[in-house]
Amino acid sequence: VGHLRIADDDVVDRSNLQRQILHTEARIGLPKVASAAVALSALNPRTSVEAVRERVTAANVERLLDGVDVVIDGADNFPARYLLNDACVKLGKPLVYGAVHRFEGQASVFDAGRHRGSAPCYRCLFPEPPPPEAAPNCAEAGVLGVLPGVIGLLQATEAIKLLLGIGDTLRGRLLQFDALAMRFRETRLAADPQCPVC
């Protein structure tokens, strides 16, 4: 990977440290993208890291994805997930999805923009976002600290496979992980012919 673009408008908070290993106590209060850029550059100085301190919005999502080969969804909110999905379908970019909640996580590759009719998009699986009261954030619901790392590693693996054009990606499959049972489950996904996006 030669270039990473990271977009987020949040700052590092103490509550992030147990589940976000790129950040440290010394960087509390710094923009998350700046903290992540420091950590990632230390891990691999040959990869350029572009830190964009912006929230993903309808007004900027296409600009943020311009020149990007693969999009990795690390969003912690549903509006950003739907914006990324819709833009990736429109722009023909693969979206590597990952989500965590309490003791469970899931990952998939949504690539409907390049595989119209044969691959689902995020909206095929989740047509509408849940109401806010049904979707607490990590601080409210709690998340097992290592779980974002497990799901993040799966996402990184899928991104590398997409970039190199090797192996079978999770396109058309949802991989679910239950940390309490230490069990993975795979569900086949189909494109929704009624999906308004893909």
What annotation goes with each model-predicted range?
Residues 1-198:
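Adenine nucleotide-associated cytosolic modules
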